[in-house]
């Protein structure tokens, strides 16, 4: 078993009772993370730090509340010379011909000061080294002294920081298959709030598959010791209500308000303390200040938007760092509601729009699964085109001007309403669009009618040699 010195920052600023509570939660989370991945671990509180005994450090870079950690050698000592001898034995070879520096921290009463210890170790190693450098040495030697214990180490690894998961109240997070919302969820988890996840599927099973892949990464990496809930709502009929039947007038904003209402109902039922979203001010049309007011108006729970002031580049960098950046993009809802986006809505208009949507219908279509079940769900990806279908009818769902500029050879152009009206079961159909979400939605609806339908994207079809007609300025 190895010994790791684990440091935290904010926990140490709390009052005695709250600090003790958070330290217990942090220690439990560390032990449970190790247990979840098949290892045993022991934790001991030592003067505002934790000592962890385990076979490896896999969980320590991923447990919220850990500021940093170091693999260390722990020794008992009687006097200063005991420590100097041990450090000399450990670092004689490591500092040979190299510059080095020594840093000592003490807790307790001793016959020597921290500076005394640094000088003594420096004197013992100086003759075999290339000198002392206290700015950027080739080898750092750290000695933390607590009572009669000395912890010796030379490397410091970064943890995620924040507060221990479970030290704050439980939230429900609206997560998509995109970049932003998983990052928002992670940031609230970092602040100590366990987050259960709510997802609205518009093109099941394709967008559900993309969402589950990201949710699995988020959960397995950052909270495998917590078996929370995932709620998946089948919202395909929203597209019919809003786009085909045109029941609503401000689709890009009204859609988000409907999602807020669904999340609100789940928060009421499961006693969540707030709703987390991945909105960043002004990033897309539904995220202007006016539209966020309209979306949030009348929601009886706090809305947490940890990304509100971040640029897309900053969000993307965090997504890559925490491992939730999507490997493939199937598009998000905005591609279905982007025809005439409203950027300066009035909350009264959005409320009237929402009244035209049967919220109860979609609440009844919510499926709940546990985090531990995510990896067991097998999505049927047969909808995705992965074979040659020369006898199929190809349908282009992109905007008409894009179709007229270039399209798959022999493809017909249909809008969403026309495509959904297809009822000929004797033919095979391949639908394509720019991002894949609209085509996946149409294919899934037609499959339920017994029609052999597939989906793909224009870019994938374009890679086939001689498959694209370039028809700029005229119709085919």
From Swiss-Prot:
Pathway: Cofactor biosynthesis; thiamine diphosphate biosynthesis. Its EC number is 2.8.1.4. It is an enzyme of class 2 (transferase). It holds the Pfam family Rhodanese. Keywords: ATP-binding, Cytoplasm, Disulfide bond, Nucleotide-binding, Redox-active center, RNA-binding, Thiamine biosynthesis, Transferase, tRNA-binding. ATP binds at residues 174-175, 256, 278, 287. Residues 388-470 form the Rhodanese domain. InterPro entries: Rhodanese-like_dom, Rhodanese-like_dom_sf, Rossmann-like_a/b/a_fold, ThiI_AANH, ThiI_fer, ThiI_N, THUMP_dom, THUMP_ThiI. It catalyses: [ThiI sulfur-carrier protein]-S-sulfanyl-L-cysteine + a uridine in tRNA + 2 reduced [2Fe-2S]-[ferredoxin] + ATP + H(+) = [ThiI sulfur-carrier protein]-L-cysteine + a 4-thiouridine in tRNA + 2 oxidized [2Fe-2S]-[ferredoxin] + AMP + diphosphate; [ThiS sulfur-carrier protein]-C-terminal Gly-Gly-AMP + S-sulfanyl-L-cysteinyl-[cysteine desulfurase] + AH2 = [ThiS sulfur-carrier protein]-C-terminal-Gly-aminoethanethioate + L-cysteinyl-[cysteine desulfurase] + A + AMP + 2 H(+). The active site is at 433 (cysteine persulfide intermediate). Disulfide bonds join 334-433. The keyword ATP-binding applies. GO terms for cellular component: cytosol. GO terms for biological process: thiamine biosynthetic process; thiamine diphosphate biosynthetic process; thiazole biosynthetic process; tRNA 4-thiouridine biosynthesis. Catalyzes the ATP-dependent transfer of a sulfur to tRNA to produce 4-thiouridine in position 8 of tRNAs, which functions as a near-UV photosensor. Also catalyzes the transfer of sulfur to the sulfur carrier protein ThiS, forming ThiS-thiocarboxylate. This is a step in the synthesis of thiazole, in the thiamine biosynthesis pathway. The sulfur is donated as persulfide by IscS. This is tRNA sulfurtransferase. It comes from Thermoplasma volcanium (strain ATCC 51530 / DSM 4299 / JCM 9571 / NBRC 15438 / GSS1). The gene is thiI.
């Amino acid at each position: 078993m190895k010994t790791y010195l684990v440091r935290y920052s904010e926990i140490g600023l709390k009052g005695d009772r709250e600090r003790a509570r958070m330290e217990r939660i942090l220690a439990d989370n560390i032990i449970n993370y190790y247990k979840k991945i098949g290892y045993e671990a022991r934790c001991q509180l030592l003067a505002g730090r934790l000592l962890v005994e385990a076979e490896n450090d896999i969980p320590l870079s991923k447990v919220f509340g850990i500021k940093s950690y170091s693999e260390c050698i722990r020794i008992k000592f009687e006097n200063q010379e005991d420590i100097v001898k041990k450090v000399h034995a450990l670092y004689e070879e490591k500092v040979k011909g190299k510059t080095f520096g020594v840093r000592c921290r003490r807790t307790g009463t001793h016959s020597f000061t921290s500076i005394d210890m640094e000088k003594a170790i420096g004197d013992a190693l100086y003759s075999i080294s290339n000198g002392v450098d206290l700015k950027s040495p080739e080898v750092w030697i750290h000695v933390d002294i607590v009572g009669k214990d000395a912890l010796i180490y030379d490397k410091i690894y970064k943890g995620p920081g924040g507060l221990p998961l479970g030290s704050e109240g439980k939230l429900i997070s609206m997560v998509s298959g995109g970049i932003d919302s998983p990052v928002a969820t992670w940031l609230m988890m970092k602040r100590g709030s366990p987050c259960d996840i709510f997802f609205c599927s518009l093109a099941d099973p394709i967008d559900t598959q993309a969402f589950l892949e990201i949710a699995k990464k988020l959960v397995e990496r950052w909270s495998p010791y917590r078996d929370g809930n995932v709620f998946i709502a089948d919202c395909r009929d929203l597209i019919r209500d809003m786009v085909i039947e045109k029941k609503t007038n401000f689709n890009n904003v009204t859609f988000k308000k409907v999602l807020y209402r669904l999340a609100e109902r789940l928060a009421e039922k499961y006693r969540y303390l707030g709703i987390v979203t991945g909105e960043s001010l002004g990033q897309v049309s539904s995220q202007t200040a006016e539209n966020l007011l309209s979306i949030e108006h009348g929601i009886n729970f706090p809305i947490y938007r940890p990304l509100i002031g971040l640029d897309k580049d900053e969000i993307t960098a965090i997504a890559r760092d925490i491992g939730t950046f999507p490997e493939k993009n199937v598009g998000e809802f905005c591609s279905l509601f982007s025809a005439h986006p409203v950027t300066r809505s009035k909350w009264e208009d959005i409320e009237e729009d929402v009244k035209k949507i049967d919220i109860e219908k979609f609440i009844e279509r919510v499926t709940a699964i546990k985090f531990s079940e995510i990896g067991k769900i097998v999505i049927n990806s047969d909808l995705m085109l992965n074979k040659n279908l020369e006898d199929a009818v190809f349908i282009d769902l992109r905007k008409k001007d894009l179709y007229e500029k270039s399209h798959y050879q022999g493809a017909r152009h249909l809008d969403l309403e026309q495509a959904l009206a297809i009822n000929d079961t004797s033919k095979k159909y391949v639908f394509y669009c720019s991002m894949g979400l609209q085509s996946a939605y149409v294919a899934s609806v037609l499959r339920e009618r017994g029609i052999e339908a597939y989906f793909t994207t224009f870019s994938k079809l374009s890679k086939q040699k001689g498959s694209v007609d370039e028809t700029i300025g005229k119709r085919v």
